[in-house]
């Protein structure tokens, strides 16, 4: 594909039957054996994803913690060394620049994991707000490959080829210098599927060997490579948000029900804090809701939500859920129509189909939190 970037794993996709698409400027596999099969593999067994297109940045220096807090809505002070935090990075109006993971290595050393489509924008935003903070910011995206191994059997399989007890890496914790098939990696118990699992950061030159080693280790258990199609249905069922769908620079964390990750009572200031405090006091005018389509059809991103002939919002993500076997979606609607049980219509092509607001936590799976 012309002018598209590739990850260090580009050469292995076809070996496994990967169908390649353009995603965020990268050649990436949308599926291997079919996204339904892959979706169920992750829910029931374990699946391996190439997520090397994600961005990474290091922030180091005396003021690293203070600087990260100035950029992020969550409370960075709660992070201990070798812990991970999910957070938003907002603009002055409270709109979301990105949602990302902050890895704390030490008081003066942080590692940020950035959405692929926002890499350049995020790094520029971070650099532009350095000000007088005593920090060094380095975009390390090109020197890191990232694999995600997700599913109920992920720990059991990965344990065969690592030199540490994976049970010691708790949910949203990390360990550096883990030998995975003899190669030094950073391993965190994190993911984007709603299942237990790990994200593995390695040198680009080690990625192919690790890919083959993990799949070979899980051959008996039925581990499979997974494409972008199933990655999206898995995150959607678990009500994990996607930048560009559920949020963007005009949508705030409060509007999408993620106020828990915007700590408005902390002493420290952060970009967007005043706007979010004001919005919380006044109340949001729109909300992200889950819905089930009652008529036959499939809701898609961008479809209008209609009540009594009036457009009240739009679908952010919609699918026929492979796990629940029904057409469900997320929609950003006017606040007065956001209560569970509210009925409205979704305009699918030229027809208005009946839908009802439901709890947006469509699927929950216990992860290891202890």
From Swiss-Prot:
The protein's enzyme class: transferase
Record EC number: 2.1.2.10
Keyword match Transferase: yes
Catalyzed chemical reaction(s): N(6)-[(R)-S(8)-aminomethyldihydrolipoyl]-L-lysyl-[protein] + (6S)-5,6,7,8-tetrahydrofolate = N(6)-[(R)-dihydrolipoyl]-L-lysyl-[protein] + (6R)-5,10-methylene-5,6,7,8-tetrahydrofolate + NH4(+)
Name of the molecule in the record: Aminomethyltransferase
Molecular function GO labels: aminomethyltransferase activity; transaminase activity
GO cellular component: cytosol; glycine cleavage complex
Function as written in the Swiss-Prot or TrEMBL entry: The glycine cleavage system catalyzes the degradation of glycine.
HAMAP family per the UniProt record, alphabetical: GcvT
Keywords: Aminotransferase, Transferase
Gene Ontology process terms (BP): glycine decarboxylation via glycine cleavage system
Subunit and partners: The glycine cleavage system is composed of four proteins: P, T, L and H.
Family according to the record: Belongs to the GcvT family.
Pfam families the UniProt entry points to: GCV_T, GCV_T_C
């Amino acid at each position: 594909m012309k002018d598209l970037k590739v990850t260090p794993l580009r050469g292995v996709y076809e070996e496994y039957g990967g169908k390649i698409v353009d995603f965020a400027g990268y050649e990436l596999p949308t599926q291997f054996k079919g996204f339904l099969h892959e979706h169920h593999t992750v829910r029931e067994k374990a699946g391996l994803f190439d997520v090397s297109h994600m961005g990474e940045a290091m922030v180091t220096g005396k003021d690293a913690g203070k600087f990260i807090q100035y950029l992020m809505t969550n409370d960075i002070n709660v992070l201990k060394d070798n812990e991970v935090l999910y957070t938003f990075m907002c603009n002055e109006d409270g709109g979301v620049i990105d949602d990302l993971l902050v890895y704390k290595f030490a008081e003066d050393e942080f590692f940020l994991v950035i959405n692929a489509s926002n890499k350049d924008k995020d790094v520029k935003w971070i650099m532009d707000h350095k000000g007088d903070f005593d920090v060094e910011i380095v975009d390390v995206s090109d020197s890191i490959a990232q694999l995600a191994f997700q599913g109920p059997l992920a720990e059991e399989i990965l344990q065969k080829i690592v030199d540490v007890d994976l049970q010691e890496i708790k949910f949203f914790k990390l360990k550096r210098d883990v030998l995975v098939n003899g190669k030094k990696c950073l391993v965190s118990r994190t993911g984007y599927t709603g299942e237990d699992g790990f994200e593995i950061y390695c040198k680009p030159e080690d990625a192919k060997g690790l890919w083959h080693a993990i799949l070979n280790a899980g051959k008996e258990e039925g581990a499979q490579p997974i494409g972008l199609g199933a990655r999206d249905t898995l995150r959607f069922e678990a009500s994990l948000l996607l930048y560009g769908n559920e949020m963007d620079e005009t949508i705030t964390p409060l509007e999408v029900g993620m106020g828990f990750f915007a700590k408005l009572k902390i002493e420290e200031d952060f970009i967007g804090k005043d706007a979010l405090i004001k919005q919380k006091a006044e109340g949001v005018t729109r909300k992200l809701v889950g819905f089930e389509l009652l008529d036959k059809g499939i809701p898609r991103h961008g479809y209008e939500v209609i009540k009594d002939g009036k457009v009240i919002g739009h679908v952010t993500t919609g699918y026929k859920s492979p796990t629940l076997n029904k057409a469900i979606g997320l929609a950003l609607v006017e606040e007065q129509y956001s209560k569970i049980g509210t009925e409205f219509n979704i305009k699918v092509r030229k027809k208005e189909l009946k839908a009802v607001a439901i709890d947006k936590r469509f699927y929950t799976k216990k992860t290891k939190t202890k």
